[in-house]
């Protein structure tokens, strides 16, 4: 039960890290009329899951989890730098490392793991940025959480964020949002299975539509979100 409690704390939407401030380009998709219904929002989140997250944030989380288990700080720093290079849009890039640094600041108070302290020092010395998936993986492994459950929680948390923002932006009913999340159960499990041992040839695969909308978001006349 202790591990379940730790995992729930890690994905708690009330964590004061500012995740609710980011749409990662979804706001642009909505303003352009690309996402305008329950069906299009469901297609959007499933596309993000199976064509973006499993090759980017989820894959890097998986690799960072293994590096943390091997006490390999050098590999963690390398993964953080590679993830930085894969995040083309400035707002999404900055948003991710701000979330990561805040998450680390919270959980380093509870987990006495030397790599967390060393990584925080590396962030302070600007040897890395501290991207959210990397820090999430490090904290989860420091708490001895199961890798598959960590990946599922990470993906579910990301999906909830997209659906919550989509329901607000389109707008849709709360029940529409719940139906979308229910339909994600099988895709989420598949994404976890695909991410346990990421295919390095697909690491950082481009997501052009999302990257373009994320960059266009900087120029929107009105917006609710920071990315």
UniProtKB/Swiss-Prot annotation:
Main location class: cytoplasm
Q: Which GO terms describe its cellular component?
A: cytoplasm
Q: Which UniProt keywords apply?
A: Chaperone, Cytoplasm, Nickel insertion
Q: Which Pfam families does UniProt cross-reference here? A: UreF
Q: Which molecular-function annotation in GO is an example for this chain?
A: nickel cation binding
In the record, the note on similarity to other proteins reads: Belongs to the UreF family.
* Quaternary structure (record): UreD, UreF and UreG form a complex that acts as a GTP-hydrolysis-dependent molecular chaperone, activating the urease apoprotein by helping to assemble the nickel containing metallocenter of UreC. The UreE protein probably delivers the nickel.
Protein's recorded name: Urease accessory protein UreF
Q: Which gene specifies this protein's sequence? A: ureF
């Amino acid at each position: 039960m202790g591990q379940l409690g730790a995992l729930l704390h890690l994905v708690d939407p009330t964590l004061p890290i500012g995740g609710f401030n980011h749409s990662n380009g979804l706001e642009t998709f909505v303003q352009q009329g690309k996402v305008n219904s329950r069906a299009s929002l469901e297609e959007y989140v499933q596309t993000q899951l199976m064509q973006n997250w499993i090759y980017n944030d989820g894959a890097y989380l998986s690799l960072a989890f293994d590096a943390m288990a091997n006490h390999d700080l050098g590999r963690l720093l390398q993964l953080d730098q590679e993830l930085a290079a894969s995040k083309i849009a400035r707002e999404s890039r900055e948003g991710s490392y701000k979330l990561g640094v805040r998450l680390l600041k919270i959980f380093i108070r509870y987990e006495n793991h030397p790599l967390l302290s060393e990584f925080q020092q590396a962030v302070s010395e600007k040897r890395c940025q501290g991207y959210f998936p990397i820090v999430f993986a490090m904290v989860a492994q420091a708490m001895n959480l199961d890798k598959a459950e960590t990946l599922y929680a990470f993906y579910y948390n990301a999906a909830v964020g997209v659906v919550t923002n989509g329901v607000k932006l389109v707008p849709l009913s709360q029940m529409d949002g719940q139906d979308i999340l229910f339909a994600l159960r099988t895709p989420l499990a598949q994404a976890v299975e695909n991410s346990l041992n990421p295919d390095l040839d697909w690491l950082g695969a481009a997501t052009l539509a999302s990257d373009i909308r994320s960059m266009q978001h900087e120029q929107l006349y009105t917006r609710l979100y920071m990315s």
